[in-house]
From Swiss-Prot:
Name of this protein: Ribosome maturation factor RimP
Transmembrane found in the keyword field: no
Species assigned in the record: Anaeromyxobacter sp. (strain K)
GO CC terms: cytosol
Function: Required for maturation of 30S ribosomal subunits.
Principal location: cytoplasm
UniProt-listed GO biological process terms: ribosomal small subunit assembly; translation
Transmembrane segments: none
Keyword Membrane: no
Compartments where found: Cytoplasm
Amino acid sequence: MTGIGEQSIAEQVRSLLEPVLERDGYELVEVEWARLAGRWTLRVFIDKAGGVGIDDCQAVSKTVEPILDVADVIEPAYDLEVSSPGLDRPLRKPRDFDRYAGQRVHVKAYGPVAGTAPGAPARKHWTGVLKGFRDGAVELDVDGVLHRVPHDQIAKANLEYDVEGDLRRKD
């Protein structure tokens, strides 16, 4: 399909695969369509209760390959990669923000957002402890101050793995 942008392909793939994966007990976390090392690559990130293993990735790959081939959404030759979202899992849906409440997150807005906390200047990035999703906004504690970032202003949000905290818990 000539002329279709990277975002459009990812959106089309998402709409094709999401219902199938949900039926099979998986959550479609993210779809990326990008040119890597000179080759087109479709990355499909999945999750499920209890986590994702290599067998899950193989099973999902076998499930989605024929769907993508029949739908013929992607014209150029490409590599398909299926994996877990990793330690820095992206957060997109309102339920993601509630599910990971208590975790450290980084949130990036499309542009500067004013009024996220009383007296706070407009900003584009926040890193803090996720409190959840309320009334159309993501709530997070940044250095003891509660910020509310409107969901429709968020370009990207993801978990931040706390290496030091994890090491302290193991001692």
